[in-house]
Amino acid sequence: MYKLIINGGIALNGHVKTAGSKNSSLPILFASILANGPITLTNTPHLSDVSTTLRLLMDMGAEFILESDNSLFIDSSNLTNLVAQYNLVKTMRASILALGPMLAKYCKAKISLPGGCAIGSRPVNLHLKALEDLGAFIKVENGYIYATAKKLIGTEIHFDQISVTATENIIMAATLATGITTIYNAAQEPEIVDLINCLIKMGAKISGAGTSIITIEGVDELSGVTYAVCPDRIEAGTYLVAATITGGKITIKNVCYQSMRAILVKLLETGADIKTEKNSITLDMKGKRPKAVNIKTSTYPNFPTDMQAQFTALNAIADGYSTITETIFENRFMHIPELSRMGASLVLEGNTVVCKGVKSLTGAYLMATDLRASASLVLAGLAAIGTTTIERVYHLDRGYEMIEEKLKLLGAQIERVQD
């Protein structure tokens, strides 16, 4: 077990390069099941969730080579074990994304009910109902999803609520289905667009990417390709908040600012100066104390739930009062007690946190609970007076590539040590 030790109060300055998107890499890796040949991915992030996905695919019969330049060669074209075991699935919610591709290509799958961050129920019923609409026979028994199909048949899918992973699963399943599938109330996240772009390059026929209505015309087969994963907008947003909360100036490279408009608007409201270029964002807080900003999470293109915890930490030391409302997950405020231990003035009322900004936080001994909550504690530690120790940082490794090394490049005093 590792922990992070942070000596806070240092303004961050410099340049940092974001990794490829975690939320693009995982579905694209599962999409490799659909291909009749190998896939090469570039800009692949080195994350524990990526490693778990690769172990899961390898357990099914895939082969892969991970290069030092963040390129990944994977051949999932001939799986021999159509079972996603609990010991691998339990740590990662995205493992449900194996279901659609396996059903589409092999007409059967056995998937353990998934795990991942403990931030709400995140039901899989949307996935299962939609797959049944496509012609699958599904039962859930002893913690496993058993799915079979003679052949998936295109149809209209109407999601009762917007779900990123359900949208991705059904898109992948429909690529090899017979006929046309139309998904209504589809999620519009950039990572879904990235998945669709990869599938189209593989030979899929898909229209409507980035809209709420996506149409897929099934094809007989998909081919292997070389594809570059898009930059991680949540990692980029987290480092921009790090500069804002410490009063620093940083430039983020390998970033697509067009996908981050909702985040950038809120950072501008804090008083930060922001300059965007083709592949970079520069934020300058000029040593100022940030202004408090109200946050309400929603589906893309609105403010992302994956940035809520980071902005809660920012508001904790901002000038003024703010509210942070979470509309996506019902249990995504587990960072509140930890921030309060540092001196933050936070009151949780239902799905809203009322925050009165304090001038400074004090370093404390903290316990990470999930991926983005962990990031918020790191941000708070960077801004705090004194030393902050954060336990259970394996949560961070699920979504941030070498976070302490990148923060060191910006001047942070942060170390990873083993218990």
From Swiss-Prot:
Could you state one GO cellular component term attached to this entry? Answer: cytoplasm
Gene3D superfamilies from the UniProt entry: Enolpyruvate transferase domain
Q: Which InterPro entries match?
A: Enolpyruvate_Tfrase_dom, Enolpyruvate_Tfrase_sf, MurA_subfamily, RNA3'P_cycl/enolpyr_Trfase_a/b, UDP_GlcNAc_COvinyl_MurA
This protein's pathway: Cell wall biogenesis; peptidoglycan biosynthesis
**Catalytic activity, as annotated:** phosphoenolpyruvate + UDP-N-acetyl-alpha-D-glucosamine = UDP-N-acetyl-3-O-(1-carboxyvinyl)-alpha-D-glucosamine + phosphate
Q: What is its main location?
A: cytoplasm
**Which residues are recorded with the post-translational modification 2-(S-cysteinyl)pyruvic acid O-phosphothioketal?**
C117
**UniProtKB keywords:** Cell cycle, Cell division, Cell shape, Cell wall biogenesis/degradation, Cytoplasm, Peptidoglycan synthesis, Pyruvate, Transferase
* UniProt EC number: 2.5.1.7
Q: Any S-S bridges, and between which cysteines?
A: none
Q: Where in the cell is it found?
A: Cytoplasm
GO MF terms, alphabetically ordered: UDP-N-acetylglucosamine 1-carboxyvinyltransferase activity
An individual GO BP term: cell wall organization
Q: Which CDD domains match?
A: UdpNAET
- What residues sit in the active site? C117
Q: Which residues, by range, are in coiled-coil regions?
A: none
Q: At which positions is phosphoenolpyruvate bound?
A: K22, N23
Pfam families, from UniProt? EPSP_synthase
Q: Which HAMAP family match?
A: MurA
Functionally, this protein is described as follows: Cell wall formation. Adds enolpyruvyl to UDP-N-acetylglucosamine.
Q: Which family does it belong to?
A: Belongs to the EPSP synthase family. MurA subfamily.
- This protein is called UDP-N-acetylglucosamine 1-carboxyvinyltransferase
Q: What's the name of its gene?
A: murA
